[in-house]
């Protein structure tokens, strides 16, 4: 989890900006969206295969 300590002369806005940057680098929001609902292993495999198909089509042109 991202943790930010606010300095004495630091504004809350800049600390919040640092916190958001750390969260995005750590992938907190993407992990949250991924775990929002349970996905069975078969559904995960289907999604992974579909993403690979899309990538192959996109870069194959």
Curated annotation (Swiss-Prot):
Residues 43-61 have a biased composition (Basic residues). One of its GO terms (cellular component) is ribosome. GO terms for molecular function: structural constituent of ribosome. InterPro entries: Ribosomal_bS21 (IPR001911), Ribosomal_bS21_sf (IPR038380). GO terms for biological process: translation. It holds the Pfam family Ribosomal_S21. Belongs to the bacterial ribosomal protein bS21 family. This is Small ribosomal subunit protein bS21.
